[in-house]
């Protein structure tokens, strides 16, 4: 099937909407394939963790571009380096951490693709003048709107499993 003339068929390495605080770039959005999936490119510096959470509406997978990340998925620890795919099915809690010494970059796929606006809204929360309690409440409310459940109770376990001192 030929590409439609009004559809973009090449997205360059420096293209996409970049969210600087999250170091996330929207690459493939819902408008490209009617919401079937989205892809974002994400950077994660050494020592940074994305806390345990569960997606109730979409499956996710990550393709590692650079560096290494440690994933904690449903109680299992997996180390992924460049070239690896990591599958995170909906309904299974997961966290990830850069336990290495160099920045990591990865592509994150969301299937279906209605999740992309979450990142835009989360960026606004992070850059706001809210105190930590207000920010946490806003993150929980945002998660409820997008089907994300944050597991604050699993953070100590994740930190211990990752071997980091947060």
Residue ranges and their predicted role:
Residues 1-37, 129-166:
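A short, N-terminal "cap"/entry segment at the start of jelly-roll beta-barrel domains
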Residues 33, 70, 90-116:
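Ligand-binding loop in jelly-roll beta-barrel domains
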Residues 75-93:
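Short acidic-glycine-tyrosine-enriched beta hairpin
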Residues 39-45, 54-73, 109-110:
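Short, conserved beta-strand element in jelly-roll/cupin
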Residues 105, 116-133:
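A hydrophobic, small-residue-rich beta->alpha segment in the mid-to-C-terminal subdomain
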Residues 23-24, 47, 89-92:
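Short acidic (Asp/Glu) patches
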Residues 2, 48, 56, 69, ...:
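Hydrophobic small-molecule pocket/channel-lining residues, especially in calycin-type beta-barrels
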Residues 28-31, 51-56, 97-99:
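Short histidine-centered beta-strand/loop micro-motifs
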């Amino acid at each position: 099937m030929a590409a439609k003339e009004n559809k973009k068929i090449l997205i360059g390495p420096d293209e996409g909407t970049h969210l600087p605080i999250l170091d996330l770039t929207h690459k493939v959005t819902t408008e490209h394939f009617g919401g079937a999936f989205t892809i974002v490119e994400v950077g994660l510096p050494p020592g940074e963790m994305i806390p345990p959470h569960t997606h109730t509406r979409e499956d996710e997978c990550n393709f590692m571009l650079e560096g290494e990340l440690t994933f904690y998925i449903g109680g299992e620890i997996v180390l992924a380096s460049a070239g690896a795919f990591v599958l995170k099915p909906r309904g299974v809690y997961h966290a990830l951490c850069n336990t290495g010494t160099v920045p990591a970059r990865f592509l994150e796929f969301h299937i279906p693709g209605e999740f992309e606006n979450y990142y835009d809204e989360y960026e606004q929360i992070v850059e706001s003048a809210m105190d930590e309690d207000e920010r946490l409440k806003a993150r929980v409310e945002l998660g409820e709107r997008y089907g994300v459940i944050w597991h604050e109770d699993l953070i100590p376990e994740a930190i211990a499993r990752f071997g980091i001192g947060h």
